[in-house]
Amino acid sequence: LALTEAEAADRGIAAVLEAAVGRPLTWDQDDVALQNIQARVRGPSVWLLANLENALLLATSNRSEAAVGYATMDGDTCGGLSPIAGIDKSYLRHWLRWLEQHGPSGSHPIPALAAVNVQQPTAELRPPSEHQTDEADLMPYDVLEAVEDSAIRDKRVPLEVFLELSPRFPQVGAAQLAAWIERFFRLWCKNQWKRERFAPSFHVDDKNLDPRSWCRFPILSGGYERELAELRAHLARVAGP
């Protein structure tokens, strides 16, 4: 779809939904829903192209997005294989900078990647005036990867993750780090249903989030409520009266 056609489809779907719910959809009240409309509008066209070419559609999700469900089901998750879903976003960004500046042995760097690497990762689903970025929505990707390693690979509870990562990120305040850790655990629990439906990927390092081959987790759970309460209680004790 051309950009104008995609925008027209987005507006048309929004108008139908507004009539169904009996009120206007606004970014203040319906942020996630409006973002997801845009992501899903793209799905039919890419599936159509794959069908026309009798091709395997590749999905774009990486492991960091899978961990916290930062993807639109039936939107950017469309596909039959997800080539980079076995690596974290921070590793992917480091790798792209390495390709730009050095490149593999016997080959050459790819300076054109500078146009990609200079940009902040963004879903580009909110209005441009919002200057949306992934890290503002979630947390810095290097922190997210560290929390994921500690919580999922090493099977630590929130307080243990906090105690492990505090010395590694001294520039981050205790309250902020604890808030990011809580966000990770809540999003992890909330989005297991998405991981059950993501396209398969490759196991390339010491962990994988694919529930069919490595990381089982219940779709419905207690959400680490008791363990997160322990983290908040520890933070209150450290802060003092």
Where are the model-predicted features located?
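ATP/NTP-dependent adenylation/nucleotidyl-transfer catalytic domains that generate, transfer
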Residues: 1-241
